[in-house]
Amino acid sequence: MTLTSAHPKSKLMKRFAALGPYLREGQCQNDHFFFDCLAVCINVKLAPEKREFWGWWIELEPSAGRFTYVYQLGLFNKEGNWNAEKISDPEVQDKLESTLRSFHLRLEEMLASIDMKLEPAADFNDQPVKLSA
C-alpha cells in the first residue's frame, strides 16, 4: 500500500520501527500508525504479565505532505489496554513528558528526512504536553 506517491507503507513501517520499541505493528491499520511507551512500572514486585505501567501512546495518520498526531498519557493495565488518566505524581509526569518529547523529536526528524511534516491533528485541542515550539 502506498500512502503517498513517494512513501510506500512498507518503507514507512521500517523507518518507524527503527525509531525504537515504540511501534506497535499489530495496531497499525491501513493509514493509521500506533506507537506507545511503557515508561514507569507501577509495581515491579508483580509477575510481568500482571504489571501495570504509566505511559503514553500516540497515533499518526498521513495526509498531503504531513502526518497528523494525537496522543494521550495514562495507564497501561494488566489486560493490555490503555486508559487515559490524569497523572498525579510529578516524578511520573516528568518521566512521561521527557520520553514523549524525546520520541516526538526523533519522529519529527525522521519525517523531515523524507520531506514530511509532523503536526497535531486539527481536532486535537487538549494537548497535555507541549511537544514543539
Curated annotation (Swiss-Prot):
Keywords on record: Activator, Cytoplasm, Transcription, Transcription regulation
Entry function: Binds to the sigma-S subunit of RNA polymerase, activating expression of sigma-S-regulated genes. Stimulates RNA polymerase holoenzyme formation and may bind to several other sigma factors, such as sigma-70 and sigma-32.
Protein name: Sigma factor-binding protein Crl
Pfam family, one: Crl
Coiled coil feature spans: none
Gene: crl
InterPro entries, alphabetized: Tscrpt_reg_Crl, Tscrpt_reg_Crl_sf
Annotated spans, Essential for activity: 99-122
Gene3D superfamilies linked: Sigma factor-binding protein Crl monomer
Disulfide bridge positions per record: none
Compartment(s) of residence: Cytoplasm
Family membership: Belongs to the Crl family.
Database matches in NCBIfam families: PRK10984.1
Gene Ontology cellular-component terms listed: cytoplasm
Gene Ontology biological-process entries: positive regulation of DNA-templated transcription
